[in-house]
Regions:
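Condensing-enzyme catalytic core of the thiolase-fold
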Residues: 1-167
């Protein structure tokens, strides 16, 4: 069988009582699990060109997830607008308990096909997200997945369920 991707690192935690509410994670819990996955994979955030986010388009959850990603990425440098931020939910809707694996499959297929699909229906970023002053970009057009196999890392797949990360 052909191997399309390898999970290099994993981070797991449970933010329990620190959650914003039952349906929204805590910023610190999200940042910790992203940091754990990067450390486990032994890669720098700056080497990652694509993040498959949980991205439910909620007014509370997305800003928390974005702030956690930004907090972690900014520890590695101040480079701006180089990492594509996307979510499979714009393509297929929320798949409930299969949402994490759907995002992971999208990330693997993106790597395999060399294309990052555009975020369909994206028009405006949430007012609580400062995209311009961040490492991230959101695109509504397909983009080539440009990577160098000699880089430390070239993809990050994020399940977003219960503070789980895979690199």
């Amino acid at each position: 069988d052909f191997i399309w991707a390898v999970i290099k690192g994993v981070g797991l935690n449970n933010d329990g009582a620190d959650k914003m509410n039952y349906m929204a994670p805590s910023l610190e819990g999200q940042a910790q699990v992203i940091s754990q996955a990067l450390a486990d994979a032994d890669v720098s955030a700056e080497s990652i060109s694509y993040v498959e986010a949980h991205g439910t388009a909620t007014p509370v959850g997305d800003p928390i997830e974005f702030a956690a990603l930004k907090k972690v990425y900014e520890r590695y440098g101040d480079k701006k607008n180089y990492c594509v931020l996307s979510s499979v939910k714009s393509n297929i809707g929320h798949a409930n308990s299969a949402a994490g694996i759907a995002g992971f499959i999208k990330a693997v297929l993106s790597l395999h096909k060399g294309i990052i699909p555009g975020t369909v229906h994206f028009k405006n970023v949430n007012a609580n997200i400062d995209l311009k002053n961040s490492p991230f970009i959101i695109t509504n057009e397909n983009r080539p997945f440009v990577y160098n196999m000699t880089q430390e890392n070239n993809d990050k797949a994020k399940s977003g369920e219960n503070n789980t990360e895979e690199l």
